[in-house]
């Protein structure tokens, strides 16, 4: 049976090229890729090409827990969309669409079987909200 899909989205006040750069640059990813303030992303390595890898280390700041979020890029269409096949086989697809307010960034991903859909949606949305904050700061520069 196919995994249930979950979609999260935000609108960032920057053009698609800038939205793409903030989403795919390792130095930017470590600044937004965590779901709450007691977590962080100390490292990220991104080889942004089909067959390239994505690896982001996500950890609780107190050191109590951490994991590597890993996958392989199956599609890279800059600055429009990318698809990542996660290490457990699930897929995540993110699109960047121009809007009157900047860029709509939408991620649809396969839910995992271990956590509730609500928890997963809330976590991924919180991460996307952090991404939006960075984009807002970027637009003010």
Segments (PLM) and residue ranges:
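Beta-strand/loop substructures that line and gate deep hydrophobic ligand-binding cavities in soluble
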Residues: 80-127, 131
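Glycine-rich portal/gate segments that line the openings of hydrophobic small-molecule binding cavities
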Residues: 41-85, 104
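Generic structural detector for well-ordered beta-strands
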Residues: 7-13, 47, 57, 72, ...
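Short, surface-exposed coil-to-beta transition loops
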Residues: 5-7, 66-70, 89-93
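Short, highly charged C-terminal tails/helix-capping segments
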Residues: 134-141
């Amino acid at each position: 049976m196919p995994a249930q899909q979950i979609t999260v989205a935000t609108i960032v006040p920057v053009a698609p090229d800038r939205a793409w750069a903030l989403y795919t640059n390792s130095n930017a990813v470590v600044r937004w890729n965590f779901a709450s303030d007691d977590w962080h992303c100390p490292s990220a390595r991104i080889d942004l090409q089909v067959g390239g890898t994505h690896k982001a280390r996500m950890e609780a700041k107190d050191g109590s827990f951490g994991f590597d979020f890993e996958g392989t890029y199956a599609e890279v269409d800059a600055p429009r969309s990318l698809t990542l096949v996660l290490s457990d086989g699930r897929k995540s697809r993110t699109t960047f669409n121009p809007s009157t307010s900047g860029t709509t960034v939408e991620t649809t991903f396969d839910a995992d079987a271990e956590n509730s859909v609500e928890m997963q949606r809330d976590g991924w949305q919180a991460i996307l909200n952090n991404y939006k904050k960075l984009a807002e700061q970027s637009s003010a520069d």
